[in-house]
Design a protein with these regions (language model features):
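Intrinsic disorder/low-complexity segments
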Residues: 15-20, 233
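Extracellular mucin-like PTS segments
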Residues: 215-235, 240-247
C-alpha cells in the first residue's frame, strides 16, 4: 500500500491507496466477502509453447484467493475453436482441489481462435446460477482473459454482453492480441500486454491485487484531483480509483 499526500476519498474515510493494475485504488476499511473468478485461457495452436506459463499464472493467482463455498469461487475455461470448462464455480470448494486440477491442465490446441464464441460460452454456461455464479446475490463477478492471438470472430458484442451482466473483465494479451484485449476488458487500463506468456510473472502482482480489492462498474467522475481523473467504482463496497497513480 502507498499513502497519498492528499486524501482523494470523500469524508476522509479511506486514506490509503492500493496498487491495482498499475494505478491506485483508494478503498474503505472493509472488503467484499467473496467473489466469483473465471479464468479464460487461450488453448489454441498459437499458445502451445506458452500454455505452461499460463497454467502457472493461474496457480499463482489462486494462491492469493480465499477459496471456499462462501468465499472465493474459481472456474477455468480453455478455448481455441471451441470453449470447454475444466471446472465450474461450484465444482471445487477447497484451494487444494483447484490447484491440483490446474496443475494437471493440458493444452487442447485447435484453430481458428474464436475468442468471441468463448466469451459467449462463459456468459451462457459459467456465469450462471447453475454453475455456481452468485451474481444474483450481489457477489462480484470477475473474468480474466489470457489471449495469444487475434480472434477469428467478433469479440465486441459478447464482451459487451458480459459487462452488461455486471462482469468485470481483465485481460492479458501478447503483442499480437493486445489491442483486441483492450477492447474486451472493462476498461483499456484493465488490459496488459506481454511479449510472450513467459513474462506473466511481471504482471502477476497487480492482477493479484485486483482480486483482493474487487471493483465493478467503472464510470468517470468530476472534478479531477491534481490533474488526475477520479473514477467511481460501484460494487458492494465503495472504491475510488485514481489514474494513473499518486506520487
Amino acid at each position: 500500500m502507498q499513502s497519498c499526500t492528499i486524501n482523494v476519498c470523500p469524508q476522509n474515510k479511506c486514506p490509503l491507496l492500493i496498487d491495482v493494475l498499475f494505478f491506485y485504488v483508494c478503498s474503505v476499511d472493509h472488503e467484499v466477502a467473496g467473489k466469483d473468478v473465471v479464468f479464460l485461457l487461450d488453448g489454441s495452436d498459437n499458445t502451445r509453447n506458452g500454455f505452461a506459463a499460463m497454467r502457472d499464472f493461474v496457480q499463482r493467482m489462486v494462491e492469493e484467493l480465499n477459496v471456499g463455498e462462501n468465499n472465493d469461487r474459481v472456474s477455468v475455461v480453455q478455448y481455441g475453436r471451441d470453449a470447454e470448462a475444466h471446472f465450474y464455480l461450484n465444482t471445487y470448494t477447497t484451494k487444494d482441489d483447484i490447484l491440483n486440477t490446474v496443475r494437471g491442465l493440458r493444452h487442447r490446441g485447435g484453430r481458428p481462435l474464436n475468442t468471441g464464441s468463448a466469451l459467449k460460452y462463459v456468459r451462457d454456461n459459467v456465469f450462471t446460477a447453475a454453475s455456481g455464479s452468485r451474481r444474483q446475490e450481489g457477489i462480484p463477478q470477475l473474468l480474466i482473459v489470457l489471449s495469444g492471438g487475434r480472434s477469428s470472430d467478433n469479440v465486441d458484442i459478447p464482451a459487451s454482453a458480459l459487462k452488461d451482466n455486471g462482469v468485470l473483465i481483465l485481460g492479458i494479451g501478447t503483442r499480437n492480441s493486445s489491442t483486441e484485449v483492450q477492447r474486451i476488458a472493462s476498461d483499456p487500463s484493465y488490459a496488459q500486454s506481454v511479449s510472450d506468456f513467459s513474462d506473466l510473472p511481471n504482471v502477476q502482482h497487480p492482477f493479484a491485487s485486483s482480486l483482493s480489492h474487487v471493483v465493478v462498474g467503472v464510470k468517470p467522475m468530476t472534478p479531477t484531483v491534481r490533474g488526475k481523473t477520479l473514477l467511481l467504482i460501484s460494487t458492494q463496497i465503495m472504491l475510488y480509483l485514481l489514474v494513473p497513480s499518486c506520487t
